């Protein structure tokens, strides 16, 4: 916890998110990238990536 700064990058003077937000929990709750899926650690929502 407390390391949300690692989930942002600055490119061409703009701040860009590396991971996406959870559609259930809303802005501020990031989903974890597990390679084959995106998962929310708060509510458990999972999106599978397409091959």
From Swiss-Prot:
Cited Gene3D superfamilies: 6.20.50.180
Biological processes per GO annotation: translation
Subunit description: Part of the 30S ribosomal subunit.
Keywords, alphabetical: Metal-binding, Ribonucleoprotein, Ribosomal protein, Zinc, Zinc-finger
Zinc finger (C4-type): 22-43
Note on cofactor: Binds 1 zinc ion per subunit.
Signal peptide: none
Family under the similarity heading: Belongs to the eukaryotic ribosomal protein eS31 family.
The keyword Hydrolase is annotated on this UniProt entry: no
The protein's required cofactors: Zn(2+)
Xref: HAMAP family: Ribosomal_eS31
Assigned GO CC terms: ribonucleoprotein complex; ribosome
Sites where the protein binds Zn(2+): 22, 25, 40, 43
InterPro entries found in the cross-reference section: Ribosomal_eS31, Ribosomal_eS31_arc, Ribosomal_zn-bd
An example molecular function term from Gene Ontology annotations: structural constituent of ribosome
Lineage: Archaea, Methanobacteriati, Methanobacteriota, Thermococci, Thermococcales
The encoding gene: rps27ae
Protein name: Small ribosomal subunit protein eS31
Top-level division of the source organism's lineage: Archaea
């Amino acid at each position: 916890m407390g390391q949300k700064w690692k989930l942002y990058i600055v490119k061409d003077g703009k701040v860009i998110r590396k991971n996406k937000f959870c559609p259930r929990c809303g802005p501020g709750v990031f989903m974890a990238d597990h390679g084959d899926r995106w998962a929310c650690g708060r509510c458990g929502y999972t999106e599978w990536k397409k091959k």
